[in-house]
Amino acid sequence: ACGSGNFLTETYLSLRRLENEVIDALLYGQVILGQVTDPIRVSIGQFYGIEINDFAVTVAKTALWIAESQMMQETEKLVRHTLDFLPLRSYANIVEGNALQMDWERVVPKRELDYIMGNPPFVGHQWRTKEQAVDLESVCKDIPKCGKLDYVCGWYVKAADYMQGTQIHAAFVSTNSISQGESVGILWKPLFTEKHLTIEFAYRTFVWTSEAKDKAAVHCVIIGFTCGSSQTTRL
């Protein structure tokens, strides 16, 4: 559920800006003898996403290509020459499909992954479609009363299953209902006791802002977690 790729694009841009700072520091005060031909190590090929909407998939790929082109121009200013770059040679790994039904291991082997992040859809049990109910049940079938959970909880369970035996770190923006009331016992107890999930950081409830005309007031939290070892926790 990567949508139009906002999270992926912003993450890519942030990492490339950091990389450009490193390149600039390495070149600072030096006389460049010959051309620096391949200084870039961060590429859009290192970013993966799953999205059910075919149009959003196209938008996400395009956004990443544009971001890559923009950052390439910034790097060229630092190395003072044109780099060999054709955007369409780069491959943005955005896959069209249902993120709760797909095998994430087939999209990217978990041993090659470091971070999972996103803003999965929030849909309360009273507003879910039949298809969404089936999605959630397929992921949470071993969790009693899972039908009462918000649709977004499926991503926590799916991620926790995928992350077993790794040091992957994950974080999701979610409706704050997952940390209140009945949802706490239904969702978090099996995640803690059976999947050995550890919360690494949490961002307190905030109101989701949107430019939509008829936007609803949605109260959100951000929860970061791992199923591997964790050194610190932050609130």
Regions found by a protein language model. Give the residues of each.
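Conserved SAM-binding strand-loop segment of SAM-dependent methyltransferases
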Residues: 92-97
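Surface-exposed acidic, glycine/proline-enriched linker/cap segments
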Residues: 24-42
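Conserved SAM/SAH-binding beta-strand->alpha-helix loop
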Residues: 53
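Signature of N6-adenine DNA methyltransferases within the class I
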Residues: 9, 16, 57, 65, ...
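Conserved SAM-binding loop
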Residues: 60
